[in-house]
Amino acid sequence: HGMNAAIDSLMSQYHRQLWEQYRLFGLEYGTGQELEQEFSEFLEPYLEAENWYPMDLKKVEKTELVSLTDRNGQILEDQILDYMRYGLLNVRWEELSEEEAGELLRSVREAAAVEEVAEQYEGHSGEALKLEKCLESIDRCLNQQKQQWEEGGKMLEDLNGDAFIRRGQQVIRQLERVPSLVERYEEEAEALGEKLAASRNFYKQKRSDISGQIASCLEEEMAVYETYISRDGERRKEVEGLKEASSNNCQYVQNTIEEAREVQEFIDQWEPDEDGEEELDEEELWEPVIRKWDQYPHLTIGVRFGVEDQEKGDLLEQVKTMLSGKLLPLVLPEGRQASGRRPDLSGAPSVLISRDEKQSAASLLERLMIGEYILRFFNRYDEKRKDPGSCDYEMEYILFGYGGDQENLEEMALRLLTLRQGMNLIHIFSDSQKREAARNLAAAIVGGIGILPLTGVVAFLIMGVWALGEAFWDVRALFDGGKIPLVKTRDSWQLSLENLLDLGKKGALSQEGKAESSGLDYRGYGRILLFLTHGSGTDYRVMDLIQSDLRQKQEEFRMDRCAHQVDMKAGICGKHVFFSLGLWKSFFGSGDTGYELDFEVSGSYL
């Protein structure tokens, strides 16, 4: 009884502010020896009490001491879950069933997988357009060759041999550029083929996270890249022939120049006879050169390539470029600035405590409950639950762990953008009208000059950028206190393709979105991110903030000096009451009639 009472008394000295502010129990201590001393002081009154069995306390030893920061964050999770299960029995919160939690996890994982796969293929769209630009470079070079050839012909008509030779040399310079331009095209085509093969393998790895219907739509869009590469293979055979043809033409032009030099030298050296009756017929002299020059087989690229409306294609790239930079200035409401505060991480548990960076072993519902605890006890961008500690965006720090509020809010905007882009892509793939609209715009961009599969490649790019532009609107609405459905419908979709191009042109949205009465707000999406990312890292960042907060009133407070469990062993000496050696004491020696017993007890907050 005395041991149990002593350990209960010891554990009752939990840190009051830790409990009042965060509903966590922790017995603050300095050293293990101090805990042993305190336990002894609680135990001794029970031993000193008058009873039939007088006892003396010989020693006290702690056998186990478990801190809140121990066991890779599991202790913290256990206390949080204990409070959330029994401390909120009469409080309404957005609880999901195990099945609903699993469905949420599958939906978000699918969105992430679709976004990752689409991002790779969107990159291939840019690479395909780059390949088309390689062909455009070859075409420009050949057009310049033709222009110089035509000008050379005019020089011959004017019987200007020196000017013709200069033009001929310019034709040669253009022809000499062709092999390197063709080789660059071949290298880009080869690289694109290899990257597509790698992306196909990447898709196979992600396929298990993508549902059948969305996978079918995605594979249909991905197939156009294979068709493009196949058709480009046919073009490559034609383009490769330009290397040999340009070399042959160089020799042809060089031979013509040599003939022209001979004619020009003859003309320059010709002198009329003394009586001046013989005249030089220059036209007749130049006739063979002119005839040969007219027969020059000037080169053309001979294949379909490029895009007709480059401006619209550039606008799509500008949207991607704009949204790949700093997001906060674009999504924060007008007049609102991000906090520049930085949490006090000196001696932070996440820095000091060695741990395994891995997902928590908590069940899906337990992960949701831990996330709900964080939402209820820590500040975030959209709501202050309590006076701020050393940073304003505590939930965001728990999620991402950067050293300052602004960096964590920037990462929050990026994660929300990525999540929404994936969900928006799923909607586009599921909506035949939007896919058709993307193909129509792609057809307008490619026009009649490019190969047909390029239209599908550009359409995939358009769908990805469209989903990104809509995600930008979504994140801006969330930062402004609005709600966005996790899964969109045609009615809840905001951004038209016309406004998407306008976004690329102006760098801002020209339309105001419809206010949504249903869906998830910033808090709701924060709950999803906490659910997805919860692990030992988030556990320790929770402890970072608790420690930082409590240090404002108690500078030396340390989470790793808050015990969750204390086990003690006491060595107690008792004396026999009804037995004494009496006169035989000297015969048996010391005459010590006591005995020693070890007692163990454990104190824990769970």
Q: At which residue positions do the language-model features occur?
A:
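Alpha-helical assembly-interface signal, strongest on the long, hydrophobic N-terminal helix that forms
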Residues: 1-33
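Long, compositionally biased low-complexity segments
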Residues: 24-606
